[in-house]
């Protein structure tokens, strides 16, 4: 497997420092790194969630539709290659809206702290889930979860709902889920995204994030 190199970012603006490292070393060193999240809003409205693979970050949890590290020299929409790699889909650039940036610090399954500068985008898609071709190593399954279920789950941690989707073999899957089944991101990230997705589905495109 080819080694991926990333830019080390520095505060206060979290711009590239000029230091480039292999991504694993940068994670181990506790450096701030740039990542992209693309959220795909579905009819309903609903959000497309991917199931995280074993190992690494939030294994087995619901996570953003698409995500990945910016490689050295990349910024903005450069990271959209992840959409095709993970979902087998070429997302039209003109359909994507920048939501904003936030900082995130989390602990992965190897007990490493990940210091992330997350650039968040959103788009809308209403074609069948079966159109996506999942990379089984990165995305075991995808789920289409109604925004209302996401909101209720995070406003009431005891609330359970059924999530439906397709696995990497395009076979139907379902699971009974609650807030604990989502990746943990400080600051109510999933709840905020759900509220934004509701507005996005109604046509709003300007957000204070």
Describe each PLM feature range.
Residues 2-37, 41-43:
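Acidic, metal-coordinating catalytic segment for phosphate/diphosphate chemistry
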Residues 12, 42-45, 53, 124-128, ...:
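Short loop segments at secondary-structure junctions
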Residues 18-26, 63-64, 79-84:
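Short acidic (Asp/Glu) patches
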Residues 28-29, 58-63, 143-144:
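A short, polar/proline- and glycine-enriched secondary-structure boundary/capping micro-motif
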Residues 30-32, 60, 111-115:
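A generic structural micro-feature
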Residues 35-69:
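A glycine-rich, hydrophobic loop/mini-helix early in the fold
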Residues 48-49, 65-99:
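The catalytic Nudix box helix
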Residues 100-108, 112-209:
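Nudix hydrolase/Nudix homology domain
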């Amino acid at each position: 497997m080819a080694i991926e190199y990333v830019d080390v970012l520095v505060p206060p603006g979290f711009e590239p420092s000029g230091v480039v490292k292999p991504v694993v070393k940068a994670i181990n060193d506790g450096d701030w790194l740039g990542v992209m999240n693309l959220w795909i809003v579905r009819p309903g409205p609903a959000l497309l969630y991917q199931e995280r693979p074993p190992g690494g970050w939030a294994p087995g949890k619901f996570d953003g539709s698409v995500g990945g590290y910016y490689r050295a020299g990349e910024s903005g929409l450069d990271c959209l290659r992840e959409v095709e790699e993970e979902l087998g889909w070429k997302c039209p650039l003109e359909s994507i809206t920048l939501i904003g940036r936030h900082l995130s610090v989390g602990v992965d399954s190897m007990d490493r702290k990940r210091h992330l500068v997350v650039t968040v985008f959103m788009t809308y898609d209403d074609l069948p889930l079966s159109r996506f071709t999942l990379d089984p190593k990165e995305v075991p399954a995808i789920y289409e979860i109604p925004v209302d279920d996401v909101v209720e789950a995070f406003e009431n941690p005891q609330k359970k709902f059924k999530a439906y989707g397709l696995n990497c073999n395009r076979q139907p899957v379902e699971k009974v889920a609650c807030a604990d089944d989502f990746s943990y991101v400080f600051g109510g990230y999933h709840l905020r995204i759900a509220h934004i997705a509701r507005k996005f589905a109604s046509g709003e495109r300007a957000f204070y994030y």
